Amino acid sequence: MTTPTAARHMVNFITGNTNKLCEVRAILQPAIQVESQTLDLIEIQGTLEEVTLDKCRRAADLVEGPVLVEDTCLCFNALNGLPGPYIKWFMKSLGHTGLNNLLAAYEDKSAQAVCTFAYSAGPGHEPILFQGITDGKIVPARGPGDFGWDAIFEYEGQTYAEMDKAAKNKISHRYRALAKLQEWFAKEMAP
């Protein structure tokens, strides 16, 4: 039996990151049911869009159903967009302090958090991209350091890590991209 809050659509979010999964579910559900699968997908090198589209196509083929994949960038304006789509590896190698040190010689600490989701209805369906951007700046780590670079990305006086999760989920780059996905589902997938 369908209830007013029952999900009308279902996607398999391809991630092994429980923090990302929690955020995506908090933003999309109950309108879109979010299941999770962990696939070891090799990421090509390229632009954020190329990486996300490639991951989505391969995930749709493996899952044989509707998939949602995500790729995130942290772009330092002083470094012409670096680390960009390679933030995961920069973060693993350098940590919060090392990322701050990359900007030590620059007055400009501004940055963009960019999130790109790709949705595919399944094998053979061309993925659709949804991108969200939040402008902020890089600061010394503040708040819990347990979710990537959240502790060094400041938006309007608070780092993502200092924010209440519900507040972050209303302004983040991930939220902005998922809002576009929700809008698309509402228009394109309406009964």
Swiss-Prot record:
Major site of localization recorded for this protein: cytoplasm
Superkingdom field: Eukaryota
Subcellular compartments: Cytoplasm; Nucleus
Gene3D superfamilies the record matches: 3.90.950.10
Catalytic activity: ITP + H2O = IMP + diphosphate + H(+); dITP + H2O = dIMP + diphosphate + H(+); XTP + H2O = XMP + diphosphate + H(+)
Any single biological process term in GO: deoxyribonucleoside triphosphate catabolic process
Residue sites binding Mg(2+) per the record: E43
A GO MF term: metal ion binding
EC number: 3.6.1.66
Top enzyme category: hydrolase
Pfam families in UniProt: Ham1p_like
Glycoprotein listed as a keyword: no
Keywords: Cytoplasm, Hydrolase, Magnesium, Manganese, Metal-binding, Nucleotide metabolism, Nucleotide-binding, Nucleus
Keyword Membrane: no
Cofactor binding annotation: Binds 1 divalent metal cation per subunit; can use either Mg(2+) or Mn(2+).
HAMAP family reported for this sequence: HAM1_NTPase
Job description of the protein: Pyrophosphatase that hydrolyzes non-canonical purine nucleotides such as inosine triphosphate (ITP), deoxyinosine triphosphate (dITP) or xanthosine 5'-triphosphate (XTP) to their respective monophosphate derivatives. The enzyme does not distinguish between the deoxy- and ribose forms. Probably excludes non-canonical purines from RNA and DNA precursor pools, thus preventing their incorporation into RNA and DNA and avoiding chromosomal lesions.
Record text on subunit structure and interactions: Homodimer.
Protein name listed in UniProt: Inosine triphosphate pyrophosphatase
